Swiss-Prot record:
Its cofactor is Zn(2+). Belongs to the class-II aminoacyl-tRNA synthetase family. Type-2 seryl-tRNA synthetase subfamily. Keywords: Aminoacyl-tRNA synthetase, ATP-binding, Cytoplasm, Ligase, Metal-binding, Nucleotide-binding, Protein biosynthesis, Zinc. One of its GO terms (molecular function) is zinc ion binding. Zn(2+) binds at C307, E356, C459. GO terms for biological process: selenocysteine biosynthetic process; seryl-tRNA aminoacylation. The keyword S-adenosyl-L-methionine does not apply. Binds 1 Zn(2+) ion per subunit. This ion is coordinated with 2 cysteines, 1 glutamate and a water molecule that dissociates from the zinc ion to allow the coordination of the amino group of the serine substrate, which is essential for catalysis. Pfam families: tRNA-synt_2b, tRNA_bind_4. This is Type-2 serine--tRNA ligase. PROSITE patterns: AA_TRNA_LIGASE_II.
Length: 500
């Protein structure tokens, strides 16, 4: 990887009298500064410089060890001290005339990358030429906010994805084989019996009394077997996630294709909307194009992962030692994901119901709680639901974004997927997960412990649609075929709604 940077520092006055001091600086001090921390023979170098009136023009060439933009930032402070102390000159701004990044690659990139004005591919080398896109955010902002580094990381991620790098999956435990009582599609059978009907939106279902009672039984099992015994407290998390929440949680790096966006109206004034109202009254049609003009930019999206909004409750706080670990859960509303062509029955939907379990504390507390949860889940799946299921370690979403996979890099953080076999398709489906997220959320939301010890957190989502798909897919809809322990908790089947 190579970098070439041509930059002009705007000074507060003519710098001709400073030429001698600058020459000495670039010949001695700058050389050491730009090699610091790099292997021998590596780093950055000033390939040329000159003074033109109140402009100090510098050319920097470098490798990956001291990138050119980092080299410039290393030079800025000592240059400011030299020019200010001896020549009463200040640095007023940074303007980049050329910034190239060259990286080895076996292909051209096919997608536009922000702040990349031009790209070319030749002889196994991919060259990116950077440019400023937002006039409000010039080169100083780009360099100080490490935009070039993020571009390099994004480029490496894309080149990796072109190679088809797969998610890591490692089997941890598998239940013994069990006899299945049903071999059909549970969703089709639920529709046939009037337990559920399609809602008006894609990937949405209306649950009748029978299906709802099944959901509530699963909820009660989770409460009685996990949440109450382990001391979890119930909260209500917001179901609208703003951009700031997703930036802090890390979801803003890649959530865009799957979220339902929320756009507020530009005005609450009824007169502003009168044209829309009148159009509908006359045509009985919704004027979507007109509405589009009257709504503002999205402020975020509908609930996607459920736990991120909880962290706003703790944001910026210092927690007393005796308050840890904190253990809470939320079951107050739906989550929404745009599944595109992947929707299928109640297994994969756009609107779903979930109990979100969150815990945080010291690393030891979080790891110990994860083990307790795993034991309780195993008890439920083995002794109450009697499922054919397995546990696997998979690459957590946040580690996948950072290009890390495998148990060797987990260092205590990681995700356990719980998968069950669907007899009608022969496929294993994820119906439950448990994640130890390390310091990610406490750091992202600036949550600290009184002791100064690093805080960790974990979360686990109980998806009621997935539990239903798996349970009915293996046991069927006839309660006589259900395990005794589950039937005790389920009780009587409620009467459904009849139609003529």
């Amino acid at each position: 990887m190579k970098f070439h940077l041509e930059v002009s520092l705007k000074l507060s006055g003519d710098a001709a009298n400073a030429e001698g001091d600058l020459a000495e600086f670039f010949e001695k001090q700058a050389v050491d500064l730009l090699k610091k921390g790099a292997p021998e023979g590596m780093g950055a170098k000033v390939a040329g410089w000159r003074i033109t009136g109140d402009q100090l023009e510098i050319k920097i060439e470098s490798d990956r060890y001291v990138r050119a933009h980092d080299a410039l930032l290393r030079l800025r402070k000592p240059l400011a001290n030299l020019l200010g102390r001896k020549h009463r000159l200040g640095i007023r701004g940074i303007n980049v005339s050329r910034f190239e990044i060259q990286i080895e690659s076996n292909r051209q990139i096919t997608h536009r990358i922000p702040y990349v004005r031009e790209s070319r591919y030749e002889d196994g080398l991919l060259t990116l030429i950077l440019g400023v896109e937002d006039p409000k955010r010039g080169w100083t902002w780009m360099l100080e906010n490490r935009i070039p580094d993020r571009i390099v990381n994004l480029l490496e991620e894309k080149l990796q994805s072109y190679g088809g790098k797969a998610e890591h999956w490692e089997l941890l435990w598998e239940s013994p084989p069990r006899e299945f009582k049903f071999s059909g599609d549970p969703t089709q059978e639920m529709v046939k019996r009037g337990w559920i009907k399609h809602g008006s939106a894609r990937g949405q279902w209306i649950h009748g009394p029978q299906s709802t009672h099944l959901f509530r039984t699963f909820e009660r099992i989770v409460l009685e077997e996990i949440l109450v015994p382990l001391g979890y407290r119930e909260m209500i998390f917001p179901k609208l996630d703003t951009w700031d929440v997703w930036k802090r949680s890390g979801h803003a790096q890649g959530v865009y294709p799957e979220i339902y966006y929320v756009c507020p109206p530009k005005s609450r004034d009824p007169a502003f909307w009168e044209e829309v109202i009148d159009y509908y009254k006359v045509t009985h049609e919704i004027p979507l194009d007109l509405i589009k003009e009257k709504i503002d930019y999205p402020i975020g999206g509908m609930c996607y992962a459920q736990c991120p909004t909880f962290w706003v409750f703790l944001q910026g706080a210092t927690l007393p030692n005796d308050e840890l670990p904190i253990k809470v859960f939320d079951r107050s509303g739906t989550s929404h994901r745009y599944e595109s062509g992947g929707i299928h029955g109640i297994e994969r939907v756009d609107e779903f119901h979930r109990i979100e379990i969150v815990w945080l504390g010291t690393k030891q507390q979080v790891m110990e709680e994860a083990e307790r949860l795993k034991e309780r889940y195993k008890h439920i799946f083995e002794e109450i639901l009697e499922l054919r299921w397995r546990m696997a370690w998979v690459t957590p979403w946040f580690m996948a974004q950072e290009g890390r996979t495998g148990l060797a890099e987990m260092e205590g953080a990681g995700t356990i997927d719980y998968e069950a076999l669907l007899p009608y398709s022969g496929n294993w489906i994820e119906f439950q997960n448990l994640s130890v997220n390390g310091e990610k959320y406490p750091k992202g939301f600036s949550v600290k412990a009184q002791s100064g010890e690093s805080l960790w957190s974990g979360c686990s989502g109980v998806g009621l649609e997935r539990w239903t798909s798996v349970f009915l897919g293996q046991k069927g809809l006839d309660p006589d075929n259900w395990p005794d322990e589950f039937r005790k908790r389920f009780g009587e089947m409620p009467r459904g709604i009849r139609f003529l």
